[in-house]
């Protein structure tokens, strides 16, 4: 990679990281990047003129880790930057004995398969555009977060504790954070839109109840990443005016299975967070 330098990512690279998100039309804002850099670590490739051309992050979660933000500026693609940083991340996780996991777009899925990842389950990003009229039920859960129960349920669903992440998200969009005895939902603000997720619940009815409550507190534009194993939830979202934006596939490196219990997950936190 003549004419470029590989280096660890830090807060001094925030402007370049945000430029990568904008170029890819992703929703991360500065708070997202600060969260990911604080809870994980990453690498970048910077050109000799100081431009951050590519990035990759890893977010460790006990026995596994999320590979995230594999981004390259459009004008510097097809130079091997993404593959190189992905392999740097894989080597780092191999040394730490952590199983790599990621959420792939259709464009990245084949690349990741060639690097040893395999499909597990899938979800779709749905968006609600500004100005769309929504009609949500009048009744729903109305409980403050009970952290002990939230963390226990999330650990069962996700497969590891991610308390720092959840507590951070609870401060980002507190009016949309709700808890019942059978589930919880959180959200955050983003560069392009608000985003709801994660939403973890014991069943689909509980998930729809939580989501309807959260939706009454916020206005579009809005993103949700809804799992494909809950077709009734996706149908309900479509009836509220949400439209499909893009699919994702959750992939695990090697022969392992995805951790946790995906049947409890209804909205993921986002492909960058898990």
Where are these regions (language model features)?
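Amide-forming acyltransferase catalytic core, primarily the GNAT-like/NAT-type
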Residues: 115-195, 205-206
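Glycine/small-residue-rich hydrophobic helix-like segments
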Residues: 185-238
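Conserved GNAT acetyl-CoA-binding A-motif
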Residues: 86, 92-105, 218-228, 248
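Active-site/acyl-donor-binding loops of N-acyltransferases
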Residues: 104, 110, 115-135, 198-200, ...
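Short amphipathic alpha-helix that is part of the acyltransferase structural core
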Residues: 1-35, 39, 46, 51, ...
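A conserved beta-strand-loop-helix scaffold within acyl/acetyltransferase catalytic domains
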Residues: 14-73, 161-202
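Conserved acetyl-CoA-binding loop-helix of GNAT-fold acetyltransferases
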Residues: 72, 78-91, 114, 204-216, ...
């Amino acid at each position: 990679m003549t004419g470029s330098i590989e280096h660890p990512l830090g807060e001094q690279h925030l402007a370049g990281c945000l430029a990568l998100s904008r170029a890819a039309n992703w929703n991360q804002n500065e708070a997202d990047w600060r969260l990911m850099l604080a809870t994980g670590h990453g690498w970048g490739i910077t050109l000799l003129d100081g431009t951050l051309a590519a990035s990759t992050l890893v977010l460790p979660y006990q026995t596994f880790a999320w590979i995230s933000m594999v981004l390259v500026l459009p004008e510097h693609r097809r130079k091997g930057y993404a593959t190189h940083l992905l392999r740097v991340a894989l080597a780092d996780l191999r040394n730490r004995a952590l199983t790599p996991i990621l959420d792939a777009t259709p464009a990245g899925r084949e690349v990741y398969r060639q690097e040893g990842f395999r499909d597990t389950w899938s979800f779709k990003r749905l968006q609600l555009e500004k100005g769309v009229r929504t009609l949500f039920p009048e009744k729903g859960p109305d409980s403050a977060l009970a952290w002990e129960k939230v963390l226990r349920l999330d650990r069962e669903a996700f497969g590891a504790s991610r308390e720092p992440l959840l507590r951070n998200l609870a401060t980002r969009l507190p009016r949309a954070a709700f808890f019942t005895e059978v589930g919880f939902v959180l959200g955050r603000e983003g560069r392009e839109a608000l985003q709801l997720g994660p939403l973890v619940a014991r069943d689909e009815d509980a998930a729809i109840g939580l989501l309807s409550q959260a939706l009454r507190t916020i206005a579009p534009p809005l993103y949700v990443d809804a799992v494909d194993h809950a077709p009734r939830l996706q149908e309900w979202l479509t009836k509220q005016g949400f439209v499909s934006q893009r699919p994702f596939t959750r992939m695990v490196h090697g022969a392992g299975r995805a951790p946790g219990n995906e049947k409890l997950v209804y909205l993921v936190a986002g492909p960058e967070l898990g």
